[in-house]
Amino acid sequence: MSVKVRLGIMMFLQFFVWGVFFVTMGTYLSQLFKGEEGINKIIGNSYATQTWAALFAPLVVGFLGDRLMNKEHLNGLLHLLGAGLLWWVSTLTDSTMIFWALLTFFICYMPTLALVNTITFQNVDNIETEFPKIRLWGTIGWIVAGLTIAESFFGLFELPILPGIESGGTTSAQFQVAAVASAIYGFYSFTLPASPPEGKGKPVDIMQILGFDSLKLMRNPSYLVFAVCSFLICIPLAFYYARTGEFVGAMHFGDRTGAYMAWGQVSEIFFMALVPFFLTRLGVKKMLLVGMLAWALRYALFGLMPSNMAVVMVGILLHGVCYDFFFVTGQLYTDRVAPKEMRTSAQALVGLLTYGAGMLVGNYVLGWWGDSIGLDPSTKEGWLEGAEKFWLMPAGFAVVVSVIFFLTFWDKKHDSKTGDVGELEADPAVS
Protein backbone atom coordinates (compact mmCIF):
# COMPACT_ATOMS: atom_id res chain seq x y z
CA MET A 1 0.00 0.00 0.00
CA SER A 2 1.45 3.37 -1.00
CA VAL A 3 2.30 6.05 1.54
CA LYS A 4 -0.33 8.40 0.13
CA VAL A 5 -3.07 5.79 0.45
CA ARG A 6 -2.05 5.06 4.06
CA LEU A 7 -2.10 8.76 4.87
CA GLY A 8 -5.50 9.13 3.17
CA ILE A 9 -6.91 6.39 5.41
CA MET A 10 -5.41 8.21 8.40
CA MET A 11 -7.22 11.43 7.46
CA PHE A 12 -10.48 9.59 6.83
CA LEU A 13 -10.45 7.95 10.27
CA GLN A 14 -9.31 11.16 11.97
CA PHE A 15 -12.43 13.06 10.99
CA PHE A 16 -14.79 10.07 11.05
CA VAL A 17 -14.20 9.75 14.81
CA TRP A 18 -15.12 13.39 15.39
CA GLY A 19 -17.92 13.70 12.85
CA VAL A 20 -19.85 10.64 13.97
CA PHE A 21 -20.98 12.30 17.21
CA PHE A 22 -20.19 16.03 17.15
CA VAL A 23 -23.06 17.07 14.86
CA THR A 24 -25.73 15.11 16.70
CA MET A 25 -24.41 15.38 20.28
CA GLY A 26 -26.69 18.35 20.98
CA THR A 27 -29.76 16.32 20.02
CA TYR A 28 -28.73 13.53 22.41
CA LEU A 29 -28.08 15.98 25.25
CA SER A 30 -31.38 17.81 24.70
CA GLN A 31 -33.23 14.51 25.13
CA LEU A 32 -31.08 13.26 28.00
CA PHE A 33 -31.64 16.43 30.04
CA LYS A 34 -35.14 17.23 28.80
CA GLY A 35 -37.01 19.41 31.27
CA GLU A 36 -33.96 20.23 33.39
CA GLU A 37 -33.22 23.82 34.35
CA GLY A 38 -30.33 25.34 32.39
CA ILE A 39 -30.49 22.75 29.59
CA ASN A 40 -29.08 25.21 27.05
CA LYS A 41 -26.09 25.92 29.26
CA ILE A 42 -25.51 22.18 29.64
CA ILE A 43 -25.36 21.84 25.84
CA GLY A 44 -23.19 24.94 25.44
CA ASN A 45 -20.79 23.83 28.16
CA SER A 46 -20.49 20.38 26.59
CA TYR A 47 -19.52 21.86 23.23
CA ALA A 48 -17.13 24.26 24.98
CA THR A 49 -14.99 21.27 25.99
CA GLN A 50 -13.70 21.11 22.42
CA THR A 51 -12.69 24.77 22.40
CA TRP A 52 -11.06 24.59 25.84
CA ALA A 53 -9.01 21.66 24.60
CA ALA A 54 -8.05 23.58 21.44
CA LEU A 55 -6.31 26.16 23.64
CA PHE A 56 -4.00 23.49 25.09
CA ALA A 57 -3.44 21.46 21.91
CA PRO A 58 -0.38 23.42 20.71
CA LEU A 59 1.44 22.63 23.96
CA VAL A 60 0.89 18.89 23.58
CA VAL A 61 2.01 18.84 19.95
CA GLY A 62 4.82 21.33 20.40
CA PHE A 63 6.37 19.51 23.35
CA LEU A 64 5.61 15.80 22.95
CA GLY A 65 5.35 15.53 19.17
CA ASP A 66 8.18 17.87 18.28
CA ARG A 67 10.66 16.85 20.96
CA LEU A 68 9.99 13.53 22.73
CA MET A 69 8.40 10.82 20.58
CA ASN A 70 7.40 9.81 17.06
CA LYS A 71 4.23 11.56 15.97
CA GLU A 72 2.53 8.40 14.69
CA HIS A 73 3.09 6.71 18.07
CA LEU A 74 1.74 9.74 19.96
CA ASN A 75 -1.26 9.82 17.62
CA GLY A 76 -1.96 6.14 18.30
CA LEU A 77 -1.75 6.50 22.06
CA LEU A 78 -4.01 9.53 22.15
CA HIS A 79 -6.69 7.83 20.05
CA LEU A 80 -6.60 4.66 22.14
CA LEU A 81 -7.11 6.79 25.26
CA GLY A 82 -9.84 8.68 23.42
CA ALA A 83 -11.64 5.45 22.58
CA GLY A 84 -11.95 4.55 26.25
CA LEU A 85 -13.12 8.04 27.16
CA LEU A 86 -15.79 8.08 24.43
CA TRP A 87 -17.18 4.76 25.63
CA TRP A 88 -17.25 6.16 29.15
CA VAL A 89 -19.20 9.21 27.94
CA SER A 90 -21.83 6.86 26.48
CA THR A 91 -22.52 5.48 29.97
CA LEU A 92 -22.89 8.82 31.80
CA THR A 93 -26.11 10.60 32.69
CA ASP A 94 -24.78 13.39 34.94
CA SER A 95 -24.08 16.67 33.14
CA THR A 96 -21.03 17.50 35.24
CA MET A 97 -19.45 14.11 34.63
CA ILE A 98 -20.20 14.36 30.91
CA PHE A 99 -18.47 17.76 30.82
CA TRP A 100 -15.28 16.45 32.41
CA ALA A 101 -15.26 13.24 30.38
CA LEU A 102 -15.70 15.17 27.12
CA LEU A 103 -13.03 17.67 28.15
CA THR A 104 -10.58 14.86 28.83
CA PHE A 105 -11.41 13.25 25.50
CA PHE A 106 -10.88 16.46 23.55
CA ILE A 107 -7.59 17.12 25.35
CA CYS A 108 -6.54 13.83 23.77
CA TYR A 109 -8.19 14.45 20.40
CA MET A 110 -7.48 18.08 19.50
CA PRO A 111 -3.67 17.72 19.39
CA THR A 112 -4.08 14.93 16.83
CA LEU A 113 -5.53 17.41 14.32
CA ALA A 114 -2.08 18.99 14.12
CA LEU A 115 -0.31 15.63 14.35
CA VAL A 116 -1.94 14.21 11.21
CA ASN A 117 -0.89 17.31 9.28
CA THR A 118 2.72 17.09 10.37
CA ILE A 119 2.80 13.32 9.78
CA THR A 120 1.69 14.05 6.23
CA PHE A 121 4.21 16.87 5.78
CA GLN A 122 7.06 14.59 6.83
CA ASN A 123 6.12 11.80 4.45
CA VAL A 124 5.19 13.39 1.12
CA ASP A 125 7.54 14.71 -1.53
CA ASN A 126 5.56 17.77 -2.57
CA ILE A 127 3.48 19.30 0.21
CA GLU A 128 1.73 21.89 -1.96
CA THR A 129 0.38 19.40 -4.49
CA GLU A 130 -0.07 16.27 -2.36
CA PHE A 131 -1.33 17.56 0.99
CA PRO A 132 -4.66 19.03 -0.28
CA LYS A 133 -5.51 15.71 -1.96
CA ILE A 134 -4.74 13.74 1.19
CA ARG A 135 -6.54 16.26 3.42
CA LEU A 136 -9.68 15.91 1.27
CA TRP A 137 -10.12 12.42 2.72
CA GLY A 138 -10.71 14.04 6.10
CA THR A 139 -13.74 15.88 4.77
CA ILE A 140 -14.94 12.66 3.16
CA GLY A 141 -14.52 10.93 6.52
CA TRP A 142 -16.71 13.56 8.19
CA ILE A 143 -19.38 13.14 5.50
CA VAL A 144 -19.37 9.34 5.77
CA ALA A 145 -19.60 9.64 9.58
CA GLY A 146 -22.81 11.66 9.25
CA LEU A 147 -24.31 9.19 6.78
CA THR A 148 -23.29 6.27 9.01
CA ILE A 149 -24.85 7.50 12.24
CA ALA A 150 -27.98 8.65 10.39
CA GLU A 151 -28.11 5.35 8.47
CA SER A 152 -29.27 7.37 5.48
CA PHE A 153 -27.65 8.43 2.19
CA PHE A 154 -27.94 12.21 2.38
CA GLY A 155 -31.57 11.76 3.43
CA LEU A 156 -32.45 10.32 0.01
CA PHE A 157 -32.82 6.69 1.07
CA GLU A 158 -32.08 4.44 4.05
CA LEU A 159 -28.58 3.09 4.53
CA PRO A 160 -28.75 0.52 7.38
CA ILE A 161 -25.05 -0.14 8.03
CA LEU A 162 -25.05 -0.25 11.85
CA PRO A 163 -26.49 -3.64 12.86
CA GLY A 164 -28.49 -3.54 16.06
CA ILE A 165 -28.45 0.25 16.32
CA GLU A 166 -31.48 2.45 15.70
CA SER A 167 -31.67 6.23 16.03
CA GLY A 168 -27.93 6.39 16.63
CA GLY A 169 -27.84 10.16 16.34
CA THR A 170 -30.28 10.62 19.22
CA THR A 171 -28.80 8.02 21.59
CA SER A 172 -25.50 7.26 23.29
CA ALA A 173 -24.74 4.80 20.49
CA GLN A 174 -23.05 7.65 18.60
CA PHE A 175 -20.30 7.75 21.22
CA GLN A 176 -19.91 3.97 21.11
CA VAL A 177 -19.50 4.00 17.33
CA ALA A 178 -16.95 6.80 17.68
CA ALA A 179 -15.14 4.83 20.41
CA VAL A 180 -14.83 1.71 18.22
CA ALA A 181 -13.58 3.80 15.30
CA SER A 182 -11.09 5.58 17.56
CA ALA A 183 -9.73 2.26 18.85
CA ILE A 184 -9.28 0.92 15.30
CA TYR A 185 -7.63 4.17 14.30
CA GLY A 186 -5.36 4.10 17.36
CA PHE A 187 -3.93 0.70 16.46
CA TYR A 188 -3.71 1.66 12.78
CA SER A 189 -1.63 4.73 13.69
CA PHE A 190 1.27 2.53 14.80
CA THR A 191 1.54 1.25 11.21
CA LEU A 192 1.89 4.74 9.71
CA PRO A 193 5.19 5.92 8.19
CA ALA A 194 7.76 6.95 10.77
CA SER A 195 7.57 10.62 11.74
CA PRO A 196 10.31 11.25 14.33
CA PRO A 197 10.41 14.41 16.49
CA GLU A 198 12.12 17.18 14.51
CA GLY A 199 12.85 19.47 17.46
CA LYS A 200 14.50 16.90 19.73
CA GLY A 201 17.15 18.53 21.89
CA LYS A 202 16.01 22.07 21.13
CA PRO A 203 14.88 24.38 23.95
CA VAL A 204 11.14 24.72 24.54
CA ASP A 205 9.76 28.19 23.73
CA ILE A 206 6.18 28.39 25.03
CA MET A 207 5.57 31.75 23.36
CA GLN A 208 6.55 30.35 19.97
CA ILE A 209 4.54 27.14 20.41
CA LEU A 210 1.38 29.16 21.13
CA GLY A 211 2.09 31.50 18.25
CA PHE A 212 2.48 34.54 20.51
CA ASP A 213 5.73 35.55 18.84
CA SER A 214 3.57 36.51 15.86
CA LEU A 215 1.81 39.20 17.92
CA LYS A 216 4.17 41.68 16.25
CA LEU A 217 1.94 41.29 13.16
CA MET A 218 -0.62 43.36 15.07
CA ARG A 219 1.52 46.40 14.31
CA ASN A 220 -0.09 46.20 10.88
CA PRO A 221 -3.44 48.01 11.42
CA SER A 222 -5.20 45.93 8.75
CA TYR A 223 -4.03 42.66 10.25
CA LEU A 224 -5.10 43.83 13.70
CA VAL A 225 -8.59 44.46 12.33
CA PHE A 226 -8.59 41.02 10.70
CA ALA A 227 -7.50 39.32 13.94
CA VAL A 228 -10.09 41.10 16.10
CA CYS A 229 -12.91 40.47 13.61
CA SER A 230 -11.86 36.81 13.27
CA PHE A 231 -12.26 36.43 17.03
CA LEU A 232 -15.61 38.24 17.05
CA ILE A 233 -17.16 36.38 14.09
CA CYS A 234 -16.40 33.05 15.76
CA ILE A 235 -18.73 33.92 18.63
CA PRO A 236 -21.85 33.52 16.43
CA LEU A 237 -20.03 30.74 14.54
CA ALA A 238 -20.30 28.56 17.64
CA PHE A 239 -24.10 28.65 17.37
CA TYR A 240 -23.94 26.65 14.15
CA TYR A 241 -21.69 23.85 15.33
CA ALA A 242 -23.39 23.41 18.69
CA ARG A 243 -27.08 23.91 17.89
CA THR A 244 -27.86 23.42 14.20
CA GLY A 245 -27.94 19.63 14.41
CA GLU A 246 -30.57 19.53 17.14
CA PHE A 247 -32.50 22.43 15.56
CA VAL A 248 -32.86 20.86 12.10
CA GLY A 249 -33.38 17.44 13.66
CA ALA A 250 -36.29 18.63 15.79
CA MET A 251 -37.82 20.72 13.01
CA HIS A 252 -37.45 18.41 10.01
CA PHE A 253 -34.96 15.55 9.83
CA GLY A 254 -35.12 13.50 13.03
CA ASP A 255 -32.89 10.43 12.93
CA ARG A 256 -31.60 11.41 9.48
CA THR A 257 -30.07 14.68 10.71
CA GLY A 258 -26.46 13.59 10.27
CA ALA A 259 -27.14 12.68 6.65
CA TYR A 260 -28.73 16.03 5.83
CA MET A 261 -26.03 17.96 7.68
CA ALA A 262 -23.44 16.18 5.53
CA TRP A 263 -24.62 18.30 2.61
CA GLY A 264 -22.78 21.16 4.31
CA GLN A 265 -19.45 19.35 3.81
CA VAL A 266 -20.37 18.57 0.21
CA SER A 267 -20.90 22.30 -0.25
CA GLU A 268 -17.55 22.92 1.40
CA ILE A 269 -15.75 20.74 -1.14
CA PHE A 270 -17.54 22.50 -4.02
CA PHE A 271 -16.75 26.03 -2.86
CA MET A 272 -13.19 25.07 -1.91
CA ALA A 273 -12.55 24.49 -5.61
CA LEU A 274 -14.01 27.92 -6.40
CA VAL A 275 -12.00 29.91 -3.85
CA PRO A 276 -9.04 30.60 -6.20
CA PHE A 277 -11.47 31.75 -8.93
CA PHE A 278 -13.31 34.19 -6.66
CA LEU A 279 -10.23 35.36 -4.79
CA THR A 280 -8.49 36.59 -7.93
CA ARG A 281 -11.63 38.55 -8.86
CA LEU A 282 -12.87 39.84 -5.51
CA GLY A 283 -9.70 40.20 -3.47
CA VAL A 284 -9.16 39.45 0.21
CA LYS A 285 -11.46 42.08 1.74
CA LYS A 286 -14.54 41.21 -0.30
CA MET A 287 -13.98 37.47 0.15
CA LEU A 288 -13.79 37.81 3.93
CA LEU A 289 -16.82 40.10 3.95
CA VAL A 290 -18.90 37.66 1.87
CA GLY A 291 -17.97 34.87 4.28
CA MET A 292 -19.06 36.93 7.31
CA LEU A 293 -22.35 38.02 5.72
CA ALA A 294 -23.08 34.41 4.74
CA TRP A 295 -23.18 33.53 8.45
CA ALA A 296 -25.68 36.32 9.05
CA LEU A 297 -27.84 35.15 6.13
CA ARG A 298 -27.80 31.54 7.31
CA TYR A 299 -28.96 32.44 10.81
CA ALA A 300 -31.60 34.81 9.44
CA LEU A 301 -33.02 31.97 7.34
CA PHE A 302 -33.08 29.66 10.36
CA GLY A 303 -34.77 32.30 12.52
CA LEU A 304 -37.31 33.70 10.09
CA MET A 305 -38.41 30.52 8.29
CA PRO A 306 -37.63 27.57 10.58
CA SER A 307 -40.61 25.50 9.41
CA ASN A 308 -39.63 25.71 5.72
CA MET A 309 -37.47 22.66 4.98
CA ALA A 310 -36.13 24.05 1.69
CA VAL A 311 -35.00 27.27 3.38
CA VAL A 312 -33.33 25.32 6.19
CA MET A 313 -31.49 23.26 3.58
CA VAL A 314 -30.27 26.47 1.92
CA GLY A 315 -28.87 27.47 5.30
CA ILE A 316 -26.99 24.17 5.54
CA LEU A 317 -25.70 24.45 1.96
CA LEU A 318 -24.34 27.92 2.74
CA HIS A 319 -21.66 26.18 4.80
CA GLY A 320 -19.25 26.16 1.87
CA VAL A 321 -19.43 29.95 1.52
CA CYS A 322 -19.42 30.53 5.28
CA TYR A 323 -16.37 28.38 5.91
CA ASP A 324 -14.28 28.56 2.75
CA PHE A 325 -14.67 32.25 1.96
CA PHE A 326 -13.75 33.33 5.48
CA PHE A 327 -11.42 30.73 6.96
CA VAL A 328 -9.53 29.64 3.86
CA THR A 329 -9.12 33.24 2.70
CA GLY A 330 -8.03 34.20 6.21
CA GLN A 331 -5.40 31.45 6.23
CA LEU A 332 -4.10 32.65 2.89
CA TYR A 333 -4.06 36.29 3.99
CA THR A 334 -2.13 35.36 7.12
CA ASP A 335 0.37 33.39 5.06
CA ARG A 336 0.89 36.41 2.76
CA VAL A 337 1.31 38.94 5.57
CA ALA A 338 3.54 36.93 7.92
CA PRO A 339 7.29 36.75 7.34
CA LYS A 340 8.47 33.30 6.28
CA GLU A 341 10.00 32.49 9.65
CA MET A 342 6.74 33.38 11.41
CA ARG A 343 4.11 31.73 9.22
CA THR A 344 3.58 28.65 11.39
CA SER A 345 3.23 30.64 14.61
CA ALA A 346 0.93 33.15 12.87
CA GLN A 347 -1.42 30.34 11.79
CA ALA A 348 -1.32 28.98 15.35
CA LEU A 349 -2.31 32.38 16.71
CA VAL A 350 -5.25 32.64 14.28
CA GLY A 351 -6.34 29.17 15.41
CA LEU A 352 -6.28 30.27 19.04
CA LEU A 353 -8.29 33.40 18.27
CA THR A 354 -10.95 31.56 16.22
CA TYR A 355 -11.39 27.87 17.07
CA GLY A 356 -10.09 28.53 20.57
CA ALA A 357 -11.08 31.86 22.13
CA GLY A 358 -13.85 32.95 19.73
CA MET A 359 -15.80 29.71 19.72
CA LEU A 360 -15.19 29.23 23.44
CA VAL A 361 -16.92 32.53 24.19
CA GLY A 362 -19.62 31.63 21.65
CA ASN A 363 -20.42 28.31 23.32
CA TYR A 364 -21.03 30.04 26.64
CA VAL A 365 -23.01 32.84 25.01
CA LEU A 366 -25.32 30.40 23.19
CA GLY A 367 -26.04 28.55 26.40
CA TRP A 368 -26.78 31.77 28.27
CA TRP A 369 -28.90 33.14 25.42
CA GLY A 370 -30.94 29.95 25.05
CA ASP A 371 -31.83 29.89 28.73
CA SER A 372 -32.47 33.66 28.78
CA ILE A 373 -35.19 33.36 26.13
CA GLY A 374 -36.58 30.15 27.64
CA LEU A 375 -35.75 27.96 24.64
CA ASP A 376 -36.92 24.35 24.95
CA PRO A 377 -34.61 22.46 22.54
CA SER A 378 -36.08 19.05 23.27
CA THR A 379 -39.22 19.46 21.14
CA LYS A 380 -40.25 20.78 17.74
CA GLU A 381 -42.74 23.11 19.39
CA GLY A 382 -40.00 24.54 21.60
CA TRP A 383 -37.77 25.28 18.63
CA LEU A 384 -40.64 26.68 16.58
CA GLU A 385 -41.48 29.09 19.38
CA GLY A 386 -37.91 30.13 20.15
CA ALA A 387 -36.14 29.89 16.78
CA GLU A 388 -36.63 33.54 15.80
CA LYS A 389 -35.15 34.99 18.97
CA PHE A 390 -32.42 32.36 19.21
CA TRP A 391 -31.07 32.63 15.65
CA LEU A 392 -31.58 36.33 14.94
CA MET A 393 -29.25 37.28 17.79
CA PRO A 394 -26.14 35.66 16.19
CA ALA A 395 -27.35 36.93 12.79
CA GLY A 396 -27.37 40.49 14.09
CA PHE A 397 -24.01 39.99 15.79
CA ALA A 398 -22.48 38.78 12.52
CA VAL A 399 -23.87 41.82 10.68
CA VAL A 400 -22.32 44.18 13.24
CA VAL A 401 -18.93 42.48 12.91
CA SER A 402 -19.22 42.65 9.12
CA VAL A 403 -19.90 46.40 9.24
CA ILE A 404 -16.94 46.97 11.55
CA PHE A 405 -14.72 44.96 9.22
CA PHE A 406 -15.98 46.77 6.11
CA LEU A 407 -15.32 50.20 7.61
CA THR A 408 -11.92 49.51 9.17
CA PHE A 409 -10.11 46.87 7.09
CA TRP A 410 -8.07 47.93 4.09
CA ASP A 411 -4.81 46.43 2.94
CA LYS A 412 -4.07 47.45 -0.64
CA LYS A 413 -0.83 45.49 -0.72
CA HIS A 414 -2.46 42.15 0.07
CA ASP A 415 -5.97 42.74 -1.31
CA SER A 416 -4.85 42.35 -4.89
CA LYS A 417 -7.30 40.68 -7.26
CA THR A 418 -4.53 39.37 -9.45
CA GLY A 419 -2.13 37.96 -6.87
CA ASP A 420 -0.94 34.37 -6.88
CA VAL A 421 -3.50 32.29 -5.03
CA GLY A 422 -1.43 29.14 -4.84
CA GLU A 423 -2.52 25.95 -3.13
CA LEU A 424 -5.03 26.32 -0.33
CA GLU A 425 -5.78 24.11 2.59
CA ALA A 426 -8.53 24.16 5.18
CA ASP A 427 -9.58 22.32 8.32
CA PRO A 428 -13.31 21.46 8.29
CA ALA A 429 -12.99 20.08 11.67
CA VAL A 430 -15.58 21.49 13.28
CA SER A 431 -17.32 21.14 9.80
Predicted regions, residues:
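Juxtamembrane intracellular "pre-TM" segments in multi-pass secondary transporters
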Residues: 1, 192-228, 425-427
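Helix-loop boundary and gating motifs at the non-cytosolic
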Residues: 1-54, 222-260, 327
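Multi-pass alpha-helical transporter architecture, strongest
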Residues: 6, 89-91, 181-193, 390-424, ...
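Hydrophobic core of transmembrane alpha-helices in multi-pass small-molecule transporters
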Residues: 12, 16, 85, 89, ...
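Central cavity-lining transmembrane alpha-helices of secondary-active solute carriers
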Residues: 44-63, 262-274
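Conserved MFS/SLC helix-loop-helix module at the cytosolic interface between two early adjacent transmembrane helices
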Residues: 56-93
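Structural signature of the two symmetry-related core transmembrane helices
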Residues: 73-87, 286-301
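A membrane-interface helix-boundary motif in multi-pass transporters
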Residues: 151-180, 368-398
